[in-house]
Amino acid sequence: MWFKNLQIYRLPAPWAITAEQLETDLAPHAFLPCSSLDMQSQGWVSPRENGALVYTLNKQIMLLLGTEKKLLPTTVINQVTKIKAAEIEEQQGFKPGRKQMKELKEDVTDELLPRAFSIWRQTWVWIDPVNGWLVVDAGSPAKADEVIKLLIKSVDKLPLDTLHVVQSPVAAMTQWLLTDEAPSGFTVDQDTELRSTGEGKATVRYVRHTLEAEDVQRHIAAGKQCTRLAMSWADKISFVLTESLAIKRVAPLDVIKENTDTTAQNDDERFDSDVMLMTGELSRMLADLVQALGGEQAKK
């Protein structure tokens, strides 16, 4: 298994916490299925089938957030409420008032919830306490925030911070394209997005298209800046760096795939192998990326 997206946070390096302590902290917030009246439920689930909420290997930690959400469209609630309101109007001789309609809508929701379908999703969390990384495999900050909020609620005085670098991703990516020179250890791939800083926010996107230096430089000279850039690191991992320092479309390249343990006998052994390989390579990639962005800002 490999993370596809990286929402990156910082912890002290090293972060002194044991798996046993973290397990104790997470246990009160373990996932419970929705009750008949719940629209949504979230909590920690076991990354493997052994029931433990904390998976550890080679000093790396994996957590898994489970989310169940009931599918009850507003249109359905409104339709049923409208039918029941008409029945009440016929009985009492006048239309229900605003307060009565509000109560009726709540009653309809409670009535329909037990019959609503559920959808489930899982969000992976990787903690590297040695190097001080906390990474959420989420495609959007909102999804990552769900994890962080529950983690802060679970772990007392969690020493978590956002990642602050000296040079903004936008400035760095624009400079790399302007000079036609990627930072050491990285290469620029074929996808990019250039956006104007003006009111119109004019945007140019290259998708699987060779980036011609003169063409890109012309757009930059016209006032556009790079907001997304496809890159590869050490010929091992491809990804897209965004203006917010989120990393998307993470994928191991052939060199990594060739190192995958083919001797694994079962799912647990394959999972162990994948985690060890992924966390080791991503930890090194993140360190190199921070260096390419001028290093981390000094804490005030």
From Swiss-Prot:
Chief place of localization: cytoplasm
GO cellular component, one term: cytoplasm
Subcellular location(s) per record: Cytoplasm, Nucleoid
One Pfam family, short name: RdgC
Keyword Cytoplasm assigned: yes
Residues of the signal peptide: none
GO biological process: one example: regulation of DNA recombination
Annotated InterPro entries: RdgC
Keyword Cytoplasm in record: yes
Keyword annotations from UniProtKB, A to Z: Cytoplasm, DNA recombination
Annotated GO MF terms: double-stranded DNA binding
Family: Belongs to the RdgC family.
Annotated function: May be involved in recombination.
Name the UniProt record assigns to this protein: Recombination-associated protein RdgC
Biological source species: Herminiimonas arsenicoxydans
